[in-house]
């Protein structure tokens, strides 16, 4: 395995999304990964208030350019209010 590939596998892209609490929003968000043959390492969804949803998604081994593209696709969804993207070393994401 190349050094670049090993480094890529040691990082996790973390997406923090705030959206309207609509029934179809979770499958649409996760679908952005599925159509790229990616499976999230972690998904956490929390509803707050009557109409708000906070979603945290973590994806291991994704490069920054693809993560930014997916974040931009999320931002274009009507129900999505905000998307934050961060890179975490795998050990900080809870997986060593």
What do the PLM-derived regions correspond to, one by one?
Residues 1-96:
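A conserved regulatory-domain signal marking ACT and ACT-like small-molecule sensing domains
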